[in-house]
Amino acid sequence: MEFRYLPMTNQDKQEMLDAIGIKSTEELFSDIPEHVRFKGEMNLKAPISEYELTKELTELASRNIHTKEYTSFLGAGVYDHYIPSVVDHVISRSEFYTAYTPYQPEISQGELQAIFEFQTMISELTGLPVANSSMYDGGTALAEAVNLSAAHTKRKKVLVSKAVHPEYRAVIDSYTRGQSIDIVEIDTVNGVTDLAQLDQAIDETIAGVVVQYPNFFGQLEPMKKIEQLLENHQKTMLIVSSNPLALGYLTPPGEFGADIVTGDTQVFGIPAQFGGPHCGYFATSKKLMRKVPGRLVGETVDEEGTRGYVLTLQAREQHIRRDKATSNICSNQALNALASSVAMSSIGKHGLRKLASVNMQKARYARKKLLEAGVELAFDGSFFNEFVIKVPGSVSKINKQLLDKGIIAGYDLAKDDKSLEGYMLIAVTEVRTKQEIDQFVKELGDIHV
């Protein structure tokens, strides 16, 4: 018999059929009506050699547009940052090269310590005492925070700013829809949350208030004023989604009274690869420690007094509590968390502040040059490394023309909100040079729409 794939032997097949008490594989599908079954063979290409396959896949991959060949000003949640070479060196080591949770601490001390260091650095950045081992990405981390606020306060309404990333808001909707949690969106004014509307919406039925800092439009929310709005609503939780790189320079949300801070560490050591995989983080106050989703690594000592690391407070988790678990998240992004840990460690505390500062300086240079070229800014508030401009005509058409010039331009905000037709979100990171920024401004000015 000629096989089109690497098969089991006929003897293997017969032994399995005998073990389950049937005579043929046909019997396995006897409950599927005959008229809906697939007949014949699938229309697959003939097999080729490994060399031929590698060549074909390489040719397919070469059609992709990537930031090694194109200059990118695209952000909106996925950013083009420099990744120190030490990151790949460390995460490629065989003892680390896994995303699986280290349930056996006696053979996983290295990985557990690395996760512990990740938690520690996130805690320092956010200004909160407890951080978990990681989440899938920034969106799921934020959605888990919303669920936690509802469970902790025993309330079923959450206020979410429209300045929060639209994809994050979509994930929140997916998480909460089946749990009868009412999501109320708060409008924006000049690129930040409408505080007057927020103030009117807060009452004794609100579980949490969700804002992003810096927000989706790159603007810095007035966190002190938001904190003041919540002073008379002690049970209502303040949930903040933050770019951790920005927190290397900005005041940590924990100092503004945030109960939960979440975000995405893609900015540290994780490449922009079709939007994933990423690594979410989740930090909170001590009072919520036993309700934190995901894994927690703790430091302890063994009976001989030797320092060690273990998964702790596991009674929260679904492999023990089942349906009473604080969350149904059942894994983490350990490998990507390690990449972020290595990146943050190699940058260092002072280096992180300098890196954040360079992002801010280059973004301000780009904004200045665009203004000089006659481009109109959408908002005039403070920002980190992203800002919104107005362009004449369709952003998608302009982006297509710029792509022909070797430039990946900003995000078309009309994709998520038709009222923002002609608005482009620009991201400028440390890897953009003065020449690249000047070229972008020139090419944008030369486009006729």
From Swiss-Prot:
Pfam family name, one: GDC-P
Catalysed reaction, written as an equation: N(6)-[(R)-lipoyl]-L-lysyl-[glycine-cleavage complex H protein] + glycine + H(+) = N(6)-[(R)-S(8)-aminomethyldihydrolipoyl]-L-lysyl-[glycine-cleavage complex H protein] + CO2
Enzyme class: oxidoreductase
Name the record gives this protein: Probable glycine dehydrogenase (decarboxylating) subunit 1
InterPro entries reported for this sequence: GcvPA, GDC-P_N, GDC_P, PyrdxlP-dep_Trfase, PyrdxlP-dep_Trfase_major, PyrdxlP-dep_Trfase_small
NCBIfam families (UniProt xref): PRK00451.1
Gene, per the UniProt record: gcvPA
Keywords annotated in UniProt: Oxidoreductase
Oxidoreductase recorded as keyword: yes
Function summary: The glycine cleavage system catalyzes the degradation of glycine. The P protein binds the alpha-amino group of glycine through its pyridoxal phosphate cofactor; CO(2) is released and the remaining methylamine moiety is then transferred to the lipoamide cofactor of the H protein.
Catalytic activity, EC: 1.4.4.2
Protein family membership: Belongs to the GcvP family. N-terminal subunit subfamily.
Subunit structure and binding partners: The glycine cleavage system is composed of four proteins: P, T, L and H. In this organism, the P 'protein' is a heterodimer of two subunits.
Biological processes annotated in GO: glycine decarboxylation via glycine cleavage system; nucleoside metabolic process
MF terms in GO: glycine dehydrogenase (decarboxylating) activity
